Amino acid sequence: MGAPTERLVDTNGVRLRVVEAGEPGAPVVILAHGFPELAYSWRHQIPALADAGYHVLAPDQRGYGGSSRPEAIEAYDIHRLTADLVGLLDDVGAERAVWVGHDWGAVVVWNAPLLHADRVAAVAALSVPALPRAQVPPTQAFRSRFGENFFYILYFQEPGIADAELNGDPARTMRRMIGGLRPPGDQSAAMRMLAPGPDGFIDRLPEPAGLPAWISQEELDHYIGEFTRTGFTGGLNWYRNFDRNWETTADLAGKTISVPSLFIAGTADPVLTFTRTDRAAEVISGPYREVLIDGAGHWLQQERPGEVTAALLEFLTGLELR
């Protein structure tokens, strides 16, 4: 199979840079990255999935990398994020795809079968589980849960605040996010992340002694270079739509995901400290499987590329896509 290529695709009023691999006409797999990442975060999976016979489309999603970065906060709501990827299917003439997402990309792919049921053959999500609709706006729920404690999602809500911290030193931001996130069992790290006070998000993450074994300096520099050029505001604006997404999807209350679904997470992912995997049954009515990778952290498809790719291929093989 040839090496992955890059091209620009106009979709849903924005232009996305898309990494593409595999034969046109083969079953399509969309790979949706999270925060603060890029299509590059799927660099290990893209060639492997293409070699297995799939047509892979991995965009820099809106707000990131080589893609459009609209100024309006509401331009990053869940309706637009899912519609962007539907537009990629239209571009290649595909009726449906398997939607795979990590972190915020997982939120996008969990919503896709609810908003665009006819365009989704199956869903695979990493790190962020499927959750039932909250009874109150999400930021209200977070404030009730965390009180006066620091919580990064609430910190991200005010335009300009987190932007200034993260944009001030993109190398520090990426270094600490990649190497400074600690597993749920690290109590001192948990206390530091929750402690009330003026410190920002990156301030609370430890400066790693060195890079994790799973990422090279060259790979980290790719992220640093892109975020130095673009800043982090586009990605932060996704967080600023939590309540808007809740308000504008009220009609989805009670609807469930009926397509085959896979959830993959690392047991050392700090996201699992404030989400519950056991509530997936409340929103998923179709076939569902969960894969937990022992000791893996948040940057799952980069930390454990072989295990993630194997889980995805096993899932894909069991689907009737051809």
Swiss-Prot record:
Residues 27-131 form the AB hydrolase-1 domain. One of its GO terms (biological process) is response to toxic substance. Keywords: Detoxification, Hydrolase. The record marks 269 as: Plays an orienting role for the imidazole group of His-298. It holds the Pfam family Abhydrolase_1. The active site is at 103 (nucleophile), 298 (proton acceptor). Coiled coil: none annotated. It comes from the Bacteria. Belongs to the AB hydrolase superfamily. Epoxide hydrolase family. This is Epoxide hydrolase A. The lineage of its organism: Bacteria, Bacillati, Actinomycetota, Actinomycetes, Mycobacteriales.
